[in-house]
Amino acid sequence: MSATGDRHPTQGDQEAPVSQEGAQAEAAGAGNQEGGDSGPDSSDMVPAAEVVGVAGPVEGLGEEEGEQAAGLAAVPQGGSAEEDSDIGPATEEEEEEEEGNEAANFDLAVATRRYPAAGIGFVFLYLVHSLLRRLYHNDHIQIANRHLSRLMVGPHAAVPNLWDNPPLLLLSQRLGAGAAAPEGEGLGLIQEAASVQEAASVPEPAVPADLAEMAREPAEEAADEKPPEEAAEEKLTEEATEEPAAEEPTSEEAVAPEEVTKSQPEKWDEEAQDAAGEEEKEQEKEKDVENKVKNSKGT
């Protein structure tokens, strides 16, 4: 390789105008030497020194232009490198973010595919909780005891019985409205009236009208249940009454049952009178004893 080939192209550009201008100046100087004495126009010719002096600034301008061209050529290369260095990391970060987003979306998609009913359990539990809460706070579902429910029921207003006389009214109305109807329809109306009467004859359940009656029922039940002592006394009295009845003659045993039922109250009255007389006698005896004691103390 030659030495000229290794040189930078910008340096060749800078030296090219200088060599051309030097050649022109030498040619002009040679012309002046040849024709300096020949004609009157020799004074108008520019000396070689002046041409060289002019060529100096021209060479300086050429060097400056070459440096500017080299700078302009170098600046795009450096700027492009810096821009590439700045753009490179930004693009890499964006690509990483996109890859991360894609991975997250893929995970979500996989989760939804693997567990499609993940949120149904929470919804079902919330629904069951709300239903149980409503059932717990609903007063119409509470079950009370029998006696409490009977006491809590208030007096019912007397409901008018619409089934007292509607069959006759229906018969009169229907027969009056269907006077022009054929005989077969009249028989059907009579059968319907009979069925309505049978439905009306069904007894209705008795409903207590007052709370007082409802409260008396437990008291009556308690009164019916007598204590064992009273039951034993009643048995003794019955046995005592049965013994004299057994000692009576057989003629009285043949008495009709009506007479026996009539004589039993009389016997009970006599026994009560005897018991009262005995009590009075005992009281009189006690009074006599007290009087005797007082008299003895007074003496």
Swiss-Prot record:
Q: Where is the signal peptide?
A: none
Q: Does the keyword Ribonucleoprotein apply?
A: no
Keyword flag Nucleus: no
- Per the record, which residues fall in region Disordered? 1-102, 215-299
Provide the coiled-coil residue spans.
270-298
Q: Where is the composition biased (Low complexity)?
A: 20-31, 46-60
Regions of biased composition (Acidic residues) lie at 81-101, 239-251, 268-281
Q: Locate the compositionally biased regions of type Basic and acidic residues.
A: 1-10, 215-238, 282-293
PANTHER family xref list: CANCER_TESTIS ANTIGEN FAMILY 47 MEMBER B1, GENE 6268-RELATED
Q: Which family is this sequence assigned to?
A: Belongs to the CT47 family.
Q: What's the name of the protein?
A: Cancer/testis antigen family 47 member B1
Its source organism is: Homo sapiens
Q: Which gene encodes it?
A: CT47B1
